[in-house]
Amino acid sequence: MPPIKENVIIYANPDHCLSCHSCELACAVAHSGGHDMIEAIAANLPLHARNKVVSVDGTAMPMQCRQCEDAPCTFACPTGACRQADGQVQIVEQHCIGCKLCVMVCPFGAITVRSETVVEQGACTNRGVAKKCDLCVDWRASTGKTAPACVEACPTKAIRMVDLDAYRIALREARAREIAKSHRHMRVQF
């Protein structure tokens, strides 16, 4: 399994998003149980993305779990199914009771509860299980990829997996360039 680096996030640039939904399809297929897209469709498997392209005021923005440092879902979960580990928010599905508290407190609307059929001791029941972006940890381990499926599928590279510290440095440098550029024409002496 590729090592999970602490403070890794999915960065989405709305200026490059075409709203093609390739990231959603790739996510759904990556979580279809080891199938590729053709197999998943041919087997009529339910495909559920853990991300969503949201269009607001003519701008498309890929949205998914932000892997919050102080994630409200981890505090709201009564069973501890939502937890912080390895620099990300994880859901231990076996402990999830489908109460939807995590859905209600997520500030990004990044968690959904899906009904799953469970067969135990010959009995078939449905139960709700919380689902969210898991940075494709299992998919990356099985495919040898270093980036999540949504990142791999984006034709414009609007979605990238970035180290938060590197992002902060790049943001700081970009803002410094903007400030320096705006001050070039100002000649103020102190």
Swiss-Prot record:
Biological processes annotated in GO: aerobic respiration, using carbon monoxide as electron donor; anaerobic electron transport chain
Question: Which Pfam family is an annotated match for this chain, by its short name?
Answer: Fer4_11
Q: Domain 4Fe-4S ferredoxin-type, which positions?
A: 8-36, 87-116, 133-164
The record's annotation in InterPro entries points to: 4Fe4S_Fe-S-bd, 4Fe4S_Fe_S_CS, ET_IronSulfur_Cluster-Binding
Q: Where does [4Fe-4S] cluster 1 bind?
A: 17, 20, 23, 154
Keyword annotations from UniProtKB, A to Z: 4Fe-4S, Electron transport, Iron, Iron-sulfur, Metal-binding, Repeat, Transport
Residue positions binding [4Fe-4S] cluster 2 = 27, 133, 136, 150
What are the protein's GO molecular function terms? Answer: 4 iron, 4 sulfur cluster binding; electron transfer activity; metal ion binding
Going by the entry's taxonomy, the superkingdom of the source organism is recorded as Bacteria
- Residues the entry annotates as binding [4Fe-4S] cluster 4: 77, 96, 99, 102
Under the heading Gene3D superfamilies, the entry gives: 3.30.70.20
Binding of [4Fe-4S] cluster 3: at which residues? 65, 68, 73, 106
Q: PANTHER family from the xrefs?
A: ANAEROBIC DIMETHYL SULFOXIDE REDUCTASE CHAIN B-RELATED, PROTEIN NRFC
Purpose of the protein: The carbon monoxide dehydrogenase (CODH) oxidizes carbon monoxide coupled, via CooF, to the reduction of a hydrogen cation by a hydrogenase (probably CooH). CooF is required in stoichiometric amounts in vitro for anchoring CODH to the membrane as well as for conveying the electrons to the hydrogenase.
Could you identify this protein by its name? Iron-sulfur protein
Organism the protein comes from: Rhodospirillum rubrum
